[in-house]
């Protein structure tokens, strides 16, 4: 396990003018934290891809189940992190991350089988570029907002359908990137998460 060296090599390649990327298990991003932090300080366009992002794949036990890693990476200044919910959001994540030339990015992926969200029924994945978007909405003002990232978005969609059948007005917000969501105007952020709707449920493995 040489994640620290892998991250350091990517930083060197980026300094030489190349566009490097590397991948590993999310749990072992702990070993890569110093080179990731350096790439942020140096504004290097390194792309770090981490898989096995939750307890959803548990064959290897708790040593391989990430809990606090998402919070640590999100707290690193200058790093853009995206956690897509399905194949459509993965494609949009690449479209968003590749043009970034002056900051490192982290793409966090699941390993277990996940459904591909039907975009004929739900909103297109292009909203990922703004960090968060309304995936499904209620008729009228929602009673509750269900927020999720990554593999948990599918769970929230199921909850939305059940609540809808029970007459509860719910909105589903896919929020693959917290820091990207800070960039759009406040008017957009308020349209996704209206301040007047305080009943909110966030679903994530950590």
PLM feature spans:
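Thiamine diphosphate
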Residues: 1-70, 89-92, 99-206
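Short, surface-exposed connector motifs at secondary-structure boundaries
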Residues: 15-21, 76-78, 139-144, 169
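Proline-centered loop/turn at the N-terminus of a beta-strand
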Residues: 17-19, 45-47, 80, 104, ...
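General beta-strand structural signal in soluble alpha/beta enzymes
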Residues: 21-23, 48-50, 81-85, 107-109, ...
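Short beta->alpha linker loops
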Residues: 27, 85-89, 151, 176
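Conserved glycine-bearing catalytic or ligand-binding loops at nucleotide- and phosphate-handling centers
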Residues: 84-100
